[in-house]
Structure formats: C-alpha cells, structure tokens
Amino acid sequence: MDQKRLTHLRQLEAESIHIIREVAAEFSNPVMLYSIGKDSSVMLHLARKAFYPGTLPFPLLHVDTGWKFREMYEFRDRTAKAYGCELLVHKNPEGVAMGINPFVHGSAKHTDIMKTEGLKQALNKYGFDAAFGGARRDEEKSRAKERIYSFRDRFHRWDPKNQRPELWHNYNGQINKGESIRVFPLSNWTEQDIWQYIWLENIDIVPLYLAAERPVLERDGMLMMIDDNRINLQSGEVIKKRMVRFRTLGCWPLTGAVESNAQTLPEIIEEMLVSTTSERQGRVIDRDQAGSMELKKRQGYF
C-alpha cells in the first residue's frame, strides 16, 4: 500500500486495521474491551472493517460498575444486537456485595474495586491473552509512553520501565502462560482525528456527546449530570438545566460535563479546533493523586 497516496485519516485507519488483524492472527483468545465511548465506537468500527464481510473473531467485554449513564447502557445493548457481536458483561461480585459506590467510598476505591479488579477478574475468568483497548497517547502522559503492544505479567501489572521495543510496525507478542498483552490500535490517533473519522464514516455514538439541556449541579469544580436518584444533595447545591455535553464518558458521578452549544459533529470538530484543555479534565479519577493514571495502570487498569 502506497502510504503517500493515503490521507492522514486513511493512514491511521490502515495502521489500526493492521494491528487488529495482527492480534487476531497471533493470539489464541483475544477480546475487545468495550467501554461504550467514542473511542470504543471507532475501534469497533475498525474491527468490523478489518473482518468484513465476516463477523468479529472475538467478543466484546464491558466491565460494568453499575454507575454508567443510562443512555450508555441502552447504546451498548443496541449496538451489540445491531452488529451481531458477542457481548460479555462482567461486574465485580465482591464489589457489588460490599455496596461499593463513588459517593460513599470515593473515586479511587470505586475505580480500583469495580474497574481494575473487575477487569482482572474477567480476563482471568475467560482466559484472554490479548485485550484491545481504546486508549490514545494524546489523552494523558502515562499513556503517551505506553507501547501499542503493552505487556502485562500474570498479575496484569504494567512496568513502564520494562517495555518492549517496537521498530516500525513489528510487534512482539511473545508471552508465557498467564501473561497477556493489552493492545491499543488507536495509540497514534488524537481526539480531533477521532471526531473527524466519526463524521467521515458516519459512526453512531452515544447522544451524551452532543450538547443538550441536561440537569446538572456544580460539585468539586465539576458539572455533574444527575442521571438517577442515587445522589444526596449537599447543603446549597441546586440542580439546574444547562446546555452541556461530554467529551469523555464514564461513571456519571465521576464524569464532568462541559458547557457547550455543539449539537452536531461539525460543531464538535470546530469546538475541538480551539480547545486548549484535555478531554480528561472532567474525569475525577485522574485527580486522585499525582501520577494516578500510571499507578492505576501498574495495578492492572485499562
């Protein structure tokens, strides 16, 4: 394939499809982590392209915390059904029994038990040796230094000082029993690339990414959208309808909205061209402590 004749987005697309096919051929039991966000939607679209007209040769896995937006759950089930994907949903049973939730136990403990431990449980349960993730290098500094093939030991831990070299497009997938690889086919994409590709390919996304009047309150410097009745209002807090959208999606008590009037994909792309902040500024879990994302990844996080 002549790279000089491909547009920037088509080069990224070709690279990602190559990575997805490489993993499917090289590993015995891969899985695609599906978190329902825009990056997951693009990654799923690329995987479907990679194996068209056949079906995906691996399942989707959603590690559920029980605190995603209702629109995310509806979108997840609708998408899996529409594309004929095998969807596995895992929720940490110990965390459920303990009643872990972000309001009572805080973002760090909630994330560790319901997401990190939940993911490790699911990978062990099904014996997956490779897991696709939608992380990109431009999102956060610890992700910027992570390889496309990210080696994890038998405890699912990542050691940033012991990463394998990746020369050109040669990836080292050699692992021993119990070890695994996290694979990031969108590593070289930016947030702007993602949105332009969604618009170019007409990819369906969760409506929460588009601006609309939604019930929100201000807490800890964040606009929190109230998605159900599991919240206790603090003194002086008032729920108001405001025009907001989300740049990133996660558990609703831990994901801040941004004020915006961007109701279409071209308007989002235009908004991104002048944005000077990271999309993850609204993620409470990234504020837990200095280097919190790298620490989480060392412990087995996505």
UniProtKB/Swiss-Prot annotation:
Biological pathway: Sulfur metabolism; hydrogen sulfide biosynthesis; sulfite from sulfate: step 1/3
Keyword Repressor found: no
GO annotation (BP), single: hydrogen sulfide biosynthetic process
Pfam family, one: PAPS_reduct
Superkingdom as given in the UniProt entry: Bacteria
GO molecular function: ATP binding; sulfate adenylyltransferase (ATP) activity
EC class of the enzyme, as a word: transferase
Keywords (A to Z) from UniProt: ATP-binding, Nucleotide-binding, Nucleotidyltransferase, Transferase
Catalytic activity: sulfate + ATP + H(+) = adenosine 5'-phosphosulfate + diphosphate
CDD domains on file: Sulfate_adenylyltransferase_2
EC number: 2.7.7.4
Family: Belongs to the PAPS reductase family. CysD subfamily.
Subunit note: Heterodimer composed of CysD, the smaller subunit, and CysN.
Biological role: With CysN forms the ATP sulfurylase (ATPS) that catalyzes the adenylation of sulfate producing adenosine 5'-phosphosulfate (APS) and diphosphate, the first enzymatic step in sulfur assimilation pathway. APS synthesis involves the formation of a high-energy phosphoric-sulfuric acid anhydride bond driven by GTP hydrolysis by CysN coupled to ATP hydrolysis by CysD.
PANTHER family: SULFATE ADENYLYLTRANSFERASE SUBUNIT 2
NCBIfam families: CysD (TIGR02039), PRK05253.1 (NF003587), PRK12563.1 (NF009214)
UniProt-recorded name of the protein: Sulfate adenylyltransferase subunit 2
Organism encoding this protein: Escherichia coli O1:K1 / APEC
Gene (name only): cysD
